[in-house]
Amino acid sequence: MIGILGGMGTQAGLDFCNKLAKINAGKLDQQYPMFVLYNKSNIPKRPENLKKYYNVLDSLVEGCKMLQKNNCKFIVMPCNTAHYWYDDLRKKVKIPILSMPKEVYLDTSKNCKKNSKIGILSTEATLSTKVYNKYFDKNFNLVSPNKNLQKNSVNKSIKLVKMGKIKEAEKAIRPAVSYLMKIKCKKIILGCTELPIAIFAYKSFKKIKQSKVFVDPNLLLANISMKKYKRF
């Protein structure tokens, strides 16, 4: 079984489950993958608790151990910022935990030349903790929007998705996407699991979607999870 530690936020966890089901859609119920979603919505807010490291870590460990206890073979976390705690979390849990940033890096390495400009849209916490820079800085030029766009476009869009206002979120993210396209990024990582919900919900960004510039870490993680699941 696949263990999914959700609740960071709830919409992102459900989005992951939906993608997991669509990837391996079967004609019978028995052909779908078995998974456990723990929507642990009481995990302390990641961006606000970077300095209270162990508050978040302890809650993540508790969630992972529950999935481990329920016979899951491996765990995924549909939250980019949560991977700031990944290294310590992995030490405290006996079953494997897939790394979303690492999988995104490996996929990008297959599709982009070395030193390519790669855009990232994410929370300020994901940017400040450098969970993607850890992998990308060696071989790519990772760029993000300026402070004004981060505040008024990216942060706003993420907040709107969490509130369930998807149409407003899609409108809010447009300026940040336009900026990264203007500076000719080869790929744009949707480095917050709320952002694909905003971007792919409507017909906007049609040309960009067709060019496959967007990287959806949730979708990528779902694909990797299915491959791993089938090996058990």
Question: What would you call each of these model-derived segments?
Answer:
Residues 1-232:
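Non-catalytic structural scaffold of enzyme domains
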